[in-house]
Amino acid sequence: MTQLIITHQSDSKLEESEVFLSELNRIKKEEDKFGKFSSLSDLRAIVKKGEFRIVSIYLSSGSILGEIFTFEFLKEFYGVLDFGSVLKVNILALDSIDKVKAFERNLLFSGFIKVKKLKGDGLNSSDSDFEIVIKAEKPSWKPEEGKVLVDDIDLEGSVPDIKNYVPLGQGKESCKSKERACNNCNCGRADLEKEIGVEAARKVYQEKVETGTARSSCGNCYLGDAFRCSGCPYKGMPAFKPGEKVSLANAEGDANDHTVDMNLIHEEKVDLITTTFDDDGSGVNNVQSKGGVLKLNI
C-alpha cells in the first residue's frame, strides 16, 4: 500500500536529524511518495496526485505542530483526505504535552475518529526514535449515507388503541375479588364474617359494591388514596368532601357506575358498663375502661 510522507517547507531542523534521514532512505526503497508543503493548497495538490490510504506527516518539534495544524487547517485538511484514510503525525522532539493534547482535541473536532497517541512507536518500525506518534482516521462512511429509521417504525402499531386504555384506579386491590377479608381489615368485612360466615359476608360485601351502598368504616375514604385501606372500593378515585355524592365503579370495571352517599365516620372512645345483681335482686353498675371505639355514621 503506497503511503504519502510529507514535511513542512519551513521545518529545516528535521532534515538535520539522522532519524528522519534514515526514514527518507526507507521511503526510496519502498517507493512511498514524499513531498513538502507550505500551505493548504500545496498539501491538497500533493494528496490529489494519488490514492493514499496512509498520510504520514513528520515534524521536528511540537511547536510547529501548534503553529501550523490549527483547528481551521485540520478542518480543511479533513476534506482533502479520502474516506477511510489514516493520518499519522510523527514528532521527533516533544517540547510541550499541552500542544499535543490541543492537537488531539482539534482532530476530534475536525471530524477524525480513533485518535490515539502512540508514544515511542514509529510509523513502520517498533524501534523508531520518534518521541511520539499521533494516529487518527477519517471515517469510511459519508454523513449522507445514514439511514432514516423513521421509515422502519410502525407508528400506528406502536401507539396503543385508546379503547384498550385501563381507566385510572382499575386493577387495584379490592375486597370483591377476594374470598376472605384482609388480615388488617378495617372495612368491617372481618367482623361480618365472624357473625354470618365467610361465604355469606362475601356475597353481602359484593352486593354493597355493585349497588353502591358501601359505607366507609375508617373515615378516610374521602381523603384520597394515600389514606385509604387496601380494599377500599374508592381506590383510584380523587379525594372528595364528606357528604358529597361520588360515582363509584364496581371492581370489574363495569361502565354502569353507581352514585353513593359518602358519610363521614365519627369515632369515640367508650367504656364498658356491666351490672351485677345481688341475691335480693338489686343491681350494681360497674364501669370498666376497655378503650373501645364506637364508629357512627354522621
Swiss-Prot record:
One of its GO terms (molecular function) is electron transfer activity. A motif (Cx2C motif 2) lies at residues 229-232. It comes from the Eukaryota. It is found in: Cytoplasm; Mitochondrion intermembrane space. Its cofactor is [2Fe-2S] cluster; [4Fe-4S] cluster. The keyword Lyase does not apply. The C-terminal domain binds 2 Fe-S clusters but is otherwise mostly in an intrinsically disordered conformation. Monomer. This is Anamorsin homolog. It comes from Cryptosporidium parvum (strain Iowa II).
